[in-house]
Amino acid sequence: MKIKLAKTELIHFIGIGGMGMSGLALIMKGKGFRVQGSDISINKNIERLKKEKIKVLIGHKKQNINKATILVISSAIKKNNPEMLEAIKKQLPIYKRGEMLANIVSLTKNIVVVGSHGKTTTTSLIASIFQETKIDPTIINGGVICLLYTSPSPRDGLLSRMPSSA
C-alpha cells in the first residue's frame, strides 16, 4: 500500500509510547514530517520523544487531534478510543502501525530480520557491522540498541526487525 504524504501533514500517533510507535514517530520526524502523539502514561520512550521535540499528550481526548491530518494507531488502541472516534467523524485517514511501516520500507532497499527468537540480537549485530564499515542505514528494531544513536534517522537504506505483531 502506498500512502501519499505531504511534508505539511501533521501525523498523530495514538499509543505513541510503545516501542514500535515511538520508533516510527522518530523516523517520520527525521524524514521531515510534523509528528505528535498521545498515550495513557509517561514512559522512557515518551521521554525520548520529548527530547527530540515531539509533542506528546498524556491521555486520549478528541481535542488531541484538532490539527492532525493523518492518524497512525497502535494495535493496542480500542475502537472506542475518543481520538479514533473523532478521526472517523472528521474522515481523517487512519493507518495501522504496520501499514505506515510498510510504506516507509517500500521506499528503500531493505534487509529484514524475521524469526521466532534472536531478532533483536541479530539486528543489533548487523547494525554494528554497518556502523564499523561506515554504512549508515536507518534501523527499525523492536528493542533499543545501545551502541547506536537513540534516535532513528532517515537514510538511503533500511534495516528492519519486524515484530511478530506487525
Task: Give the location of each predicted region.
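ATP-dependent carboxylate-amine ligase
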Residues: 1-45, 50-57, 67-71, 87-92
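Hydrophobic alpha-helical segments, chiefly the membrane-spanning helices
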Residues: 162-166
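Phosphate-binding loop of NTP-binding sites
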Residues: 4, 27-33, 50, 63-64, ...
